Amino acid sequence: MRMTLAVAIVAASLWAGGAQLHAHHAFAAEFDVNRPLTLKGTLVKWEMVNPHSWFHVDIKDKDGKVSTWMIEGGSPNQLIRMGVTKTTVPVGTELVIEGYQAKDGTQKAVGRNFVLADGKRLFLGGSAGGVSDPSKAK
């Protein structure tokens, strides 16, 4: 009886944890592939945290009002391996963000690429559905 209860608890824990991990990494749960966007702004803050990094970017609208968008990127390890670091993209950098907006319409998106002023494109990794590292294209 005791062994059966222990096995049931372990099984339930693994099942619940697995569902949570899957939900966390599901692009479609939070972002809309049918709402691609391109934003131009200034990087004001980095958050190099696991499991996804966050970039805070000030975006000026057509009336000159500034709002801060949160852009999700890949894990710190993934970004560093692709050359996206606090040295290559320091706070204050003007950039263009290509990505997909959050389903809830907030000022949040998953980034696909950063495009720097010199035209250099940096892949952001992350959870964007159907997006892969362009440097590995055949």
Predicted regions and their residues:
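Hydrophobic helical h-region of N-terminal Sec-dependent signal peptides
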Residues: L5-L14
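Sec/Tat signal peptide C-region and signal peptidase I cleavage site
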Residues: W15-A23
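Short boundary/loop segments of OB/S1/cold-shock single-stranded nucleic-acid-binding domains
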Residues: H22-L37
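Conserved hydrophobic positions within beta-strands
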Residues: G41-L43, E94
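Short aromatic-glycine-enriched beta-strand elements
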Residues: V49-K60
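Short, structured beta-strand/loop micro-motifs enriched in basic residues and often containing a Trp
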Residues: E72-R81
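Short nucleic-acid-contacting surface segments enriched for D/E, G, S/T with interspersed K/R
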Residues: R81-I97
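OB-fold/S1-family single-stranded nucleic acid-binding modules
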Residues: A102-G126
